[in-house]
């Protein structure tokens, strides 16, 4: 492998152009897509190299009003953010007894019927259904920490996904306000939540390099380029996007034996919408796909590198051997992963996600200031070596299969 072709400094310089919020379906995400397109046009070209954009639409909930007011034994309104996707309360809201149910254990939920409940965790599909079955009238999540100050006191935006029937509504309150609600003995509250659904447009960016000999076998290298609305998402996941760009540049010069597609997915943070659109749109072609190499969370100096593999267990052994040969520390995990690699594995294509521990994910602190040349270059070289070995192998080294255990978990994940 020609290591001189991989530059962490170049990757960081490009990443610095994206120090803005890129929420899916907004002008920020569109601006990022345009920057990526222009960079590819200027730096990656040649015979057998093609670029395309694939727009897609998705539905998003827009919060119109969210309020939480204590009515007994004191009166006070708290700052909250509405939970997107859980429907709306009646116009005048819902007033009910208030109860702290901690982690939603069986004993605490035995008292939840008819009450608006405060919970410690994020209410996702399974927890939501648990609250509905317990007869809760509504829910309040908490976010943040007891040491937050200033703008960090704003509650986080949360979304409920994959639920068709939404009989109860909820909001998020900051940790410090949650403490006050419990310690002051709030016993009755009014919850108001109004939201409406709107259609948004995102897009996937795809650069294809035709294979020189085994063009009918396809490898993909992917990362999402959107961010959450709370921050500019340098670590999550513009760093991953620029790593894919480095590999794209590398293989445009060192042409692969197998066809490679470099994918920048939109709307990952909204529910893997970009990668799901890709695997649905290219369903027939997926039979030719051998492996997806995804990057999600990268670039910070302090942390550990992890590769999560969703496929045959021998893939872990092969990737471990590659890492040993390169002398790069990495931990291998054999499981499904909460990123775009799941979309491929769900459709039967073995997949991996390269991931690095870090700080500030989904917050305003996730900025380019925390990203390092050293980390970007190291992760780029590791992934490039893996991709080059797989792209150039005379016979592909592992089967195109996803174990039944993972298929069941993925069906539940996407249900």
Please tell me what each predicted stretch does.
Residues 229, 265-359, 364:
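Metal-dependent peptidase/peptidase-like ectodomains
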Residues 1-5, 19-28, 117-122, 166-168, ...:
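Second-shell loop/turn segments in exported
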Residues 249, 360-415:
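His/Asp/Glu-rich mid-to-C-terminal helical/loop segments that flank catalytic regions of hydrolases
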Residues 78-163, 167-169, 330:
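Extracellular/luminal Protease-associated
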Residues 1-8, 13-113:
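Noncatalytic luminal/extracellular "stalk/propeptide" segments of secretory-pathway proteins
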Residues 1-28, 54, 150-151, 159, ...:
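N-terminal capping segment at the start of a domain
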Residues 80-100, 104-106, 155-234, 246-249, ...:
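Soluble metallo-hydrolase cores and metallopeptidase-like ectodomains found primarily
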Residues 6-27, 36-47, 116-121, 138, ...:
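Catalytic-core environment of secreted peptidases
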């Amino acid at each position: 492998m020609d290591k001189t072709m991989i530059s962490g400094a170049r990757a960081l310089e490009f990443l610095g152009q994206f120090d803005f919020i890129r929420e899916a379906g907004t002008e920020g995400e569109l601006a990022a897509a345009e920057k990526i397109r222009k960079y590819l046009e200027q730096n990656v070209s040649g015979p057998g190299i093609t670029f395309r954009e694939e727009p897609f639409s998705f539905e998003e909930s827009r919060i119109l009003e969210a309020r939480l007011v204590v009515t007994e034994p004191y009166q006070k309104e708290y700052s909250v953010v509405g939970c997107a996707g859980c429907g709306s309360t009646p116009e005048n809201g819902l007033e009910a007894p208030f109860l702290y149910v901690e982690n939603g254990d069986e004993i605490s939920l035995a008292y939840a019927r008819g009450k608006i409940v405060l919970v410690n965790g994020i209410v996702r599909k399974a927890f939501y259904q648990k609250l509905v079955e317990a007869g809760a009238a509504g829910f309040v999540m908490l976010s943040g920490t007891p040491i937050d100050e200033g703008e960090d006191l704003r509650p986080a935006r949360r979304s409920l996904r994959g639920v068709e029937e939404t009989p109860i509504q909820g909001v998020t309150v900051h940790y410090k306000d949650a403490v006050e609600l419990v310690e002051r003995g709030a016993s009755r509250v009014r919850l108001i939540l109004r939201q409406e659904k709107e259609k948004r447009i995102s897009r996937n960016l795809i650069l294809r390099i035709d294979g020189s000999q085994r063009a009918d076998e396809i490898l993909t290298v992917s990362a999402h380029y959107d961010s959450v609305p709370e921050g500019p998402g340098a670590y999550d996941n513009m760093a991953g996007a620029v790593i894919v760009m480095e590999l794209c540049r590398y293989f445009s010069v060192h042409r692969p034996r197998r066809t490679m597609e470099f994918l920048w997915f939109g709307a990952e943070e909204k529910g893997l919408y970009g990668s799901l659109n890709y695997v649905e749109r290219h369903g027939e072609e997926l039979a030719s796909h051998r492996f997806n190499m995804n990057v999600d969370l990268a670039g910070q100096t302090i942390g550990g590198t992890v590769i999560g593999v969703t496929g045959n267990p021998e893939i872990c052994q092969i990737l471990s051997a590659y890492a040993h040969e390169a002398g790069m520390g990495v931990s291998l995990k054999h499981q499904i992963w909460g990123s775009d690699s799941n979309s491929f594995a769900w459709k039967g294509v073995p997949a991996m996600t390269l991931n690095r521990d870090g700080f500030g994910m989904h917050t305003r602190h996730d900025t380019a200031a925390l990203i390092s040349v050293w980390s970007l270059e190291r992760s780029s070289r590791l992934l490039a070596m893996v991709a080059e070995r797989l792209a150039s192998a005379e016979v592909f080294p592992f089967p195109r299969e996803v174990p039944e255990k993972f298929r069941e978990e993925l069906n539940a994940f996407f249900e």
